[in-house]
From Swiss-Prot:
It holds the Pfam family Formyl_trans_C. Signal peptide: none annotated. The keyword Transcription regulation does not apply. HAMAP family: Formyl_trans. Attaches a formyl group to the free amino group of methionyl-tRNA(fMet). The formyl group appears to play a dual role in the initiator identity of N-formylmethionyl-tRNA by promoting its recognition by IF2 and preventing the misappropriation of this tRNA by the elongation apparatus. SUPFAM superfamilies: FMT C-terminal domain-like, Formyltransferase. It is an enzyme of class 2 (transferase). GO terms for cellular component: cytosol. Belongs to the Fmt family. This is Methionyl-tRNA formyltransferase. It comes from the Bacteria. Keywords: Protein biosynthesis, Transferase. GO terms for molecular function: methionyl-tRNA formyltransferase activity.
């Protein structure tokens, strides 16, 4: 297969994993587009994206326009004369003129099985909804939000102990192989594009800190899914004794209870059992204000008086 001249567009670590795979391949990465350097850390020092750092280390030209809507930036991109543009978590909207510039158009690596979860947070929403599988879709981009024709899909089962952090890592490993496979198929003309079924599409909205508040009137199953979806950010939490307490890990209990939602059923080193709107949820790992995440056994050693049975956990949602 003749090597493709590729423009790569991406910003975070997830994207950098895919850029590394392209660098290691026989294709030519002729330019990298990434978001402008941003202030980061306590000193608010301008910091390059992981994609920029990787590109610079391999002497690949880097472009950082604030927008691709203006003609000078579009002409600059067209002058590169790329065969294809690969987009992975870039963060800028590509207008139609840019999508149509490369000979083979622009393709995107999306962290879900389309059209199930379009949008910014497909990994988190798959967990939040209790999906049994996720995966990676390589898609031909159009002007819509993740609405383009699907070129290739890979599948990944969602395990009971998966969180957004673990799924992110698994998909970051799965995506680059899928991308290289899709590029080979495009170059050889062996890929068949598949239209998305609009009836099956959902929008994966970004998570919010407000959404991470645990509402004990929900079922134990839904709360268990939310805790996994919101790990590592923004982390599920409840309010108790005037403090915000984060919850990092839970499991669904086999205990039955008709106590009011939010009531502590039992508290031991094995976990704190809390009544919900349907079933009982066991809290396994929590984080007190200003402290590191700890096992419930350690939490009870420090603050056992906060979590005595029949105590009702405070929650503004109640």
């Amino acid at each position: 297969m003749k090597p493709l001249n590729i423009i790569f567009a991406g910003t975070p670590d997830f994207a950098a994993r895919h850029l590394q795979a392209l660098i290691n391949s026989h294709h030519n990465v002729i330019a990298v587009y990434t978001q402008p350097d941003r202030p980061a850390g306590r000193g608010k020092k301008l910091t390059a994206s992981p994609v920029k750092e990787l590109a610079v280390s391999h002497d690949i030209p880097v472009y950082q326009p604030g927008s691709l809507r203006k003609e000078p930036a579009q002409q600059e991109l067209a002058a590169l004369n790329a065969d294809i543009m690969v987009v992975v978590a870039y963060g800028l909207i590509l207008p139609k003129v840019v999508l149509d510039t490369p000979r083979l158009g622009c393709i995107n690596v999306h962290g879900s099985i389309l059209p199930r979860w379009r949008g910014a947070a497909p990994i988190q929403r798959a967990l939040w909804a209790g999906d049994k599988e996720t995966g990676v879709t390589i898609m031909q981009m159009d002007v819509g939000l993740d609405t383009g024709d699907m070129l290739l899909k890979t599948y990944l089962p969602i395990e009971d102990d998966d969180t957004s952090a673990t799924l992110y890592e698994k998909l970051a490993q799965q995506g680059p192989d899928a991308l290289l496979q899709a590029l080979e198929g495009l170059a050889n003309g062996t890929l068949t594009a598949e239209k998305q079924d609009e009836a099956l599409a959902n929008y994966a909205e970004k998570l919010s800190k407000e959404e991470a508040r645990l509402d004990w009137s929900k079922s134990a199953t839904q709360l268990w899914q939310e805790v996994r979806a919101f790990n590592p950010w923004p982390v599920s939490y409840f309010e108790h004794q005037g403090n915000t307490i984060k919850v990092w890990q839970t499991q669904i209990s086999t205990t039955s209870s008709n106590a009011a939602p939010g009531t502590i059923i039992s508290a031991s080193k094995k976990g704190i059992e809390v009544a919900t709107g349907d079933g009982v949820l066991t809290l396994l790992s929590m984080q007190l204000p200003g402290k590191k995440p700890l096992s419930v056994a350690d939490i009870l050693n420090a603050r056992g008086d906060w979590f005595t049975p029949n105590t009702r956990l405070n929650n503004e949602a109640q």
